[in-house]
Swiss-Prot record:
The keyword Transcription applies. The keyword Membrane does not apply. PROSITE patterns: RNA_POL_BETA (PS01166). It catalyses: RNA(n) + a ribonucleoside 5'-triphosphate = RNA(n+1) + diphosphate. One of its GO terms (biological process) is DNA-templated transcription. Belongs to the RNA polymerase beta chain family. GO terms for cellular component: DNA-directed RNA polymerase complex. This is DNA-directed RNA polymerase subunit beta 1. It comes from Nocardia farcinica (strain IFM 10152).
């Protein structure tokens, strides 16, 4: 029913070129042996398809019609649900229909620039009907601005790019469970009917073998009471459930006479305080389970119930029916009795078994369209109440649809979702892979999902049904482990929200190219072989018995005739990021997890370089991520510049593609595009015209290929530390550009308007040298911390004047108006070059918040070279911090004098079990050197013809689970091309004789040398290093604030104090607890003494001690300090003008704690 079919006609091919289907793709020699009959689907389809369904996009409607399903858009569906809205008497009604959109108001770029939301005006047709007179009034009503999805699956909300993450939730339906009672150790079974919205209905067999029911989580009562309340007589119950002693015993004990008594009994349990009547009890039960407004199973819930219980009622409603309840009770009784099958009312035989809630047949995905639809449903239901009230209060003659409707609840619900929902995330834009995986994320958290505190191990664990649907490797480390997943490469979400994966159909033992998409439930009924099972020329299995997967079982050997399906690709089970790890099959899963996650943290470098050793996934990932410019129509390149590429298409149309130049991403990395085509070049549709960040020739390029030696070196690479060559610093090999945005606004204050100006009090001309006449820094200026970016003054109010000044003011009638310098300055520890300025002003009709007259944004770019303390990583979870940067001449070098770029420690490999990094190093050397296979060796018999010879600097693809074998690596290492001196520097084992750069002597043992792909991660030491001398203090405790963002101090905690006490360092400890912390008077005096060169004065009483005294006083304990029988005043030594002294020294004693925005990642 749900299976999609794709028929591809092709036969086994020997072509080794990775990434077919993208014209102009760079050549990459592939070790792949297995032909994939199905191309990787669009990697952003989970977002774009779902949003297309929501708004009823024309291309989505065309695809739905082609599939043979009725194209009902999500918005039309929710409007149909709520219509008609009737008043309390039923005399008039309002019907909403035909949702449609006008053109979006501004382009994506303009929205980002001006802090707007990328949205289109949304209109519906509202029809008001007066049922008494038959009068109909129809009107088009504006429903607000509807946020639209960009071409790359994102939303722009208030100028920031956001992603709505898909949510993994338990599917509506009926679920059967089994547990063992702790006291009696008897089996107890239960059943739950879970709707999409509405009350739960729970049945259970307890340890006393009685069958009970709980309605809406209330008190348990016999199941026969519910059946009688539904109108069943005792005879009918006996006729239907006569086979079940459980129910017959319950019926015998049941003293409820008939339907009326049963209804009253249920009412008493559900509404204990209210007086029960037959009508109210009947309405209560009807509203709980049988009214569409109050109870909704959703299409998927109805499908799951019908499938589980074997009901085949055509056009069954989305509410519960008597048949559902009766079939659920019968299923539970038979399950408790230990039966294996049951004949459903329709004559269908269904298996009787308990459900696994973590199975992907019972968990579904709420994609972006459904999440927004649910939010609109909430907004419309709030609007419905307003409409009802207005119907009763307004004059019937004067009513129009527009006057009845208030769209504010709908707009507010949308705003709330996009702005504050856990599933609407600030987009991860560190690099194209990060943004792509962000859109393919599946989260079990969020409203209606799990909470990370309550989620147990079972729900986080890898499940066999995840195969081909959700990646078993890629998930965050930390509290969210297992609750966030990523869609596998070939997976797709079907109309019910279940994740499907494709399989090749096996017919009469022959593997065909016909592809079926199966859900986890459907796959459980079949026997599936893996993609790398050898086939003959006709597509039949070579082995008589082959390993397969079956429901609930480990891999087992079966006869080849029993196989129903075969995987379409070896990389079918992993996600995009995991599929980009070469030799994944040789890495431990924990390290592969780190490798997949760390690829998302790579920062774009000044010059990107595609990996020598790739997996063939790089091109497709980069193109689908949307950071490269892709040609739309075949034609000829007419004009190329740094800012745009113009293509004259074959049909005579001309299109210019604009480049993004040095834009700031959400994470502060640099997003820049540059053309890779030439004037006059022929380009095909789908060909990459320009590279973006982290791409080279249209392929994902997250790092650099560096010559690596794996060896210890003087202990400087102990514990994962890394030694780098100075060459990488000098030649900007690992240099990245980071762009910071600084913003300031000029507001109206109670004392007058703030002003952006060059005229700043008490500031020298040197400081103002880079400011223009408006007071804004010029583009191109080099700035460092403390420099003024935008000059601004704020009114201070009237000041106290001396009598003489007062007399002069009275004579000349001039007020003493003073201003404070509140200029925007470069924050502590930052520097760079000003690359952009945006000025928004109320005078220019820019849309600014209330009270703001002017807003200035300054963009400062910083070129960060690699340095000690920065974090580097490979793709196999092999991460480390740079411990030392050696001069190039001191680095170990090869026999031909080539110095290595990076030295990694051998200890980083064995216990971590990520051998993939060693194999990558060897294959990297092979690709860099080139190779030629001589003769006809045994190891090369499976290599495609084109792989027998390759020039130097060849890029290679080794796809996951279908890559280079160990014997091929050994053979190719022995077949590498010699250098210009005719030498092969690396032997068959991948090792070379290295020479010590300092002494020129060879090291006593051969060392593994090759090329490894190294990423520079976003954990940069410049963002983390922090020091403070004086700074802000907390208003309450008078102690320094904490953290780099607040320019805080280092916490000296309780245990650190113990350490000081243990060493008897009394004076150091006193200093730390007083003048370096909260001795308000003492710290000012110390600062003064340091400035003047005097001795440090005695510390005073810390503020926290005074707080302690106040707390004791609150307990009615008076604390006094006595000296020679006389009380000593604790406030002793308070300098009345210490505030003034501090001000003169330029320090602020009690700056309030600033609230800083923290970015949420992933």
């Amino acid at each position: 029913m749900l299976e999609g079919r794709i028929v591809t006609v092709s036969s086994r091919t020997e072509s080794p070129l990775a990434a077919p289907g993208v014209p102009g793709a760079p050549r990459r020699l592939s070790f792949a042996r297995i032909r994939e009959p199905l191309a990787v689907p669009g990697l952003l389809d989970i977002q774009t398809e779902s949003f297309g369904w929501l708004i009823g996009a024309p291309d989505w409607c065309a695809r739905a019609a082609a599939r043979g399903t009725e194209p009902v858009a999500g918005l039309a569906e929710v409007l149909a649900e709520i219509s008609p809205i009737e008043d309390f008497a039923g005399t008039m009604s309002l019907t909403l229909s035909d949702p449609r959109f006008e053109e979006v108001k501004a382009s994506v770029e303009e929205c980002k620039d001006k802090d707007l939301t990328y949205a289109a005006p949304w209109f519906v047709t509202a029809e008001f009907v007066n049922n008494n007179t038959g009068e109909i009034k129809s009107q088009t009503v504006f429903m607000g601005d509807f946020p639209m999805m960009t071409a790359h699956g994102t939303f722009v909300v208030n100028g920031t790019e956001r992603v709505v993450v898909s949510q993994l939730v338990r599917s509506p339906g009926v679920y059967f469970d089994h547990a063992i009672d702790k006291g009696s150790e008897k089996d107890v079974h239960s059943a739950r009917v879970i709707p999409s919205r509405g009350a739960w209905l729970e049945f259970d067999v307890d340890k006393r073998d009685t069958l009970g029911v709980r309605i809406d989580r209330k008190r348990r009562q016999p199941v026969t009471v519910l059946l009688k309340a539904l109108g069943w007589s005792a005879e009918r119950i006996a006729e239907r459930f006569g086979f079940a002693p459980l129910i017959m015993a319950s019926l015998a004990k049941d003293n409820v006479a008939g339907t009326d008594d049963a209804l009253l009994e249920i009412h008493r349990k559900l509404r204990p305080g209210e007086p029960p009547t037959k009508e109210s009890a009947q309405n209560l039960l009807a509203n709980l389970f049988f009214t569409e407004k109050r109870y909704d199973l959703a299409r998927v819930g109805r499908y799951k119930i019908d499938k589980k219980l074997g009901l085949r009622a055509p056009g069954a409603p989305r509410v519960l029916t008597e048949d559902d309840i009766a079939a659920t009770i019968e299923y539970l009784v038979r399950l408790h009795a230990g039966e294996r099958t049951m004949i459903a009312p329709g004559g269908v035989e269904v298996p009787v078994e308990v459900d696994d809630i973590d199975h992907f047949g019972n968990r579904r995905v709420r994609t972006v369209g459904e999440l927004i639809q649910n939010q609109i449903r909430v907004g419309l239901s709030r609007m419905e109440r307003v409409v009802r009230e207005r119907m009763t209060t307004q004059d019937v003659e004067a009513i129009t649809p527009q006057s009845l409707m208030n769209i504010r609840p709908v707009v507010a619900a949308m705003k709330e979702f996009f702005g504050t929902s856990q599933l609407s995330q600030f987009m991860d834009q560190r690099n194209p892979l990060a943004s792509l995986t962000n859109k393919r994320r599946l989260s079990a958290l969020g409203p209606g999902g799990l909470s990370r505190e309550r989620a147990g191990l079972e729900v986080r664990d890898v499940h066999y049904s995840h195969y081909g649907r959700m990646c078993p490797i890629e998930t965050p480390e930390g509290p969210n482990i297992g609750l966030m997943g990523y869609l596998s490469v070939y997976a797709r979400v079907n109309p019910f929200g279940f994740v499907e994966t494709p399989y090749r159909r096996v017919v009469d033992g022959r593997v065909t190219d016909e592809v079926d998409y199966l859900t986890a439930d459907e796959e459980d009924r079949h026997v599936v072989a893996q993609a790398n099972e050898p086939l003959d020329a006709e597509g039949r299995f070579l082995a008589a018995r082959i390993p397969v997967r079956r429901k609930n079982s480990e891999v087992e050997l079966v006869d080849s005739a029993a196989v129903d399906y075969m995987d379409v690709s070896p990389r079918q089970m992993v996600s995009v990021a995991t599929a980009m790890i070469p030799f994944l099959e040789h890495d431990d899963a924990n390290r592969a997890l780190m490798g997949a996650n760390m690829q998302r943290q790579a920062v774009p470098l000044i010059r990107s370089e595609a990996p020598i050793v790739g997996t063939g996934m790089e091109l497709r990932a980069a193109v689908d991520a949307g950071d490269v410019v892709v040609n739309e129509k075949a034609g000829v390149v007419e004009e190329v510049s740094a800012d745009y590429v113009t293509v004259m298409a074959d049909d005579g149309t001309r299109k210019s593609y604009r480049m993004r130049k040095f834009n700031r991403s959400n994470q502060g990395t640099c997003s820049n595009q540059r053309p890779i085509v030439d004037e006059g070049q022929r380009v095909e549709a789908g060909q990459v015209l320009a590279d973006g960040p982290c791409t080279e020739n249209g392929e994902m390029a997250l790092g650099k290929n560096l010559l690596v030696a794996i060896m210890p070196w003087e202990g400087h690479n102990y514990e994962d530390a890394i030694i780098l060559s100075q060459r990488l610093v000098e030649q900007d090999v690992l240099t990245s550009i980071h762009i910071e945005e600084h913003e300031i606004d000029a507001r109206d204050t109670k004392l007058g308007a703030e002003e952006i100006t060059r005229d700043i009090p008490n500031v020298s001309d040197e400081v103002l040298a880079d400011l223009d006449e408006r007071g804004i820094v010029r583009i191109g200026a080099e700035v460092r911390d403390g420099d003024i970016l935008v000059g601004k003054v704020t009114p201070k109010g009237e000041t106290e004047l001396t009598p003489e000044e007062r007399l002069l003011r009275a004579i000349f009638g001039e007020k003493a108006r003073e201003v404070r310098d509140t200029s925007l300055k470069v924050p502590h520890g930052e520097s760079g070059k000003v690359i952009g300025i945006r000025v928004f002003s109320r005078e220019d009709d820019d849309d600014l918040p209330p009270g703001v007259n002017e807003l200035v944004r300054v963009y400062v770019a910083q070129k960060r070279k690699i340095q000690d303390g920065d974090k580097l990583a490979g793709r196999h979870g092999n991460k480390g911090v740079i411990g030392k940067i050696l001069p190039t001449e001191d680095m170990p070098f090869l026999p031909d004098g080539t110095p290595v770029d990076i030295i990694l420690n051998t200890h980083g490999v064995p216990r971590r079990m990520n051998i993939g990094q060693i194999l990558e190093t060897h294959l990297g050397w092979i690709g860099k050197a080139g190779w030629k296979v001589e003769g006809n060796p045994e190891w090369a018999k499976d290599l495609p013809e084109e792989m027998w010879e390759a020039p130097a600097d060849s890029n290679i693809a080794t796809p996951v689970f279908d890559g280079a074998r160990e014997e091929e690596l050994t053979g190719l290492l022995g077949s590498t091309l010699p250098n210009r001196d005719g030498e092969r520097m690396v032997d068959d084992n991948g090792k070379a004789v290295l020479f010590d750069g300092r002494s020129g002597e060879p090291f006593p043992y051969p060392v593994a040398v090759g090329y490894m792909y190294i990423l520079k991660l976003h954990h940069l030491v410049d963002d983390k290093i922090h020091a403070r001398s004086t700074g802000p203090y907390s208003m309450i405790t008078q102690q320094p604030l904490g953290g780099k963002a607040q320019f805080g101090g280092q916490r000296f905690g309780e245990m650190e104090c113990w350490a000081m006490q243990a060493y008897g360092a009394a004076y150091t400890l006193q200093e730390l607890l007083t003048i370096k912390s909260d001795d308000v008077v003492g710290r000012v005096k110390v600062y003064e003494a340091i400035v003047k060169g005097d001795n440090i004065p005695e510390p005073g009483v810390p503020e926290s001690f005074k707080v302690l005294l106040k707390e004791l006083q609150a307990l009615c304990l008076n604390v006094e300090v006595l000296s020679a029988g006389a009380a000593v005043e604790l406030a002793h030594g308070v300098d009345d003008d210490h505030e003034r002294t501090a001000a003169n020294l330029g320090i602020n004693l009690s700056r309030a704690e600033s609230i800083t925005e923290t970015e949420l990642s992933g």
